[in-house]
Amino acid sequence: MLNILFADGFEEVEALSVVDMARRAGIEVKMISLNETNEVIGGHNISIICDCMLKDAAIDDGVVLPGGIPGVPNIEKNPDAIEFIKKHYNENKLIAAICAAPTLLGRIGLLDNKKAVCYPDLMDELICKEKVDENVVIDSNIITSKSAGTALDFAFEIIKYLKDETVAKKVKNAIYY
């Protein structure tokens, strides 16, 4: 199962592209609210209802951190969310972050020995072993990506990681990508 963290102010395209493409690939996805209810409001005032709240979530195959401001700061100020992310990391599970979210991973020490990318205007804030100017960067169990414009590529790399290239190609073909 793939966990996706939703905090108020999340970037809708980055989060929901991953949910949609992963489900099309047959990956079970759990949308996790960091709020006191299952409802979360995105950065562009799109409300979604998550599957559960963080207190009811478990460590699974991976965790995705969408970008967005104030979405990423809202994840970062939640100590339970940080612990949840670190538990996935410590169990060598997939950690995928896009846009502003890789900067959070850097600040909590998860990119110390990794190459990564983030939203171009935030590259100076990215703490990692090597900054790479690519749309999606994969280093071991960490996948990072630039922005809403690279969200589908990000989703397909997550599918490749959890399934394989063939499944990712089938989903791409199904949406005429």
Language-model-detected regions and their locations in the chain:
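A conserved active-site-flanking secondary-structure segment within enzyme catalytic domains
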Residues: L111-V136
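Conserved beta-strand segments that form the floor/walls of ligand-binding pockets within enzyme
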Residues: L5, V64, A96-A97, V117, ...
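Short, hydrophobic beta-strand segments that form beta-sheet elements in well-ordered domains
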Residues: K30-S33, I95-C99, K115-Y119
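Extended, subdomain-level signal for the structured scaffold at the beginning of enzyme domains
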Residues: M1-E91, L104-R107, E125-D133, N141-Y177
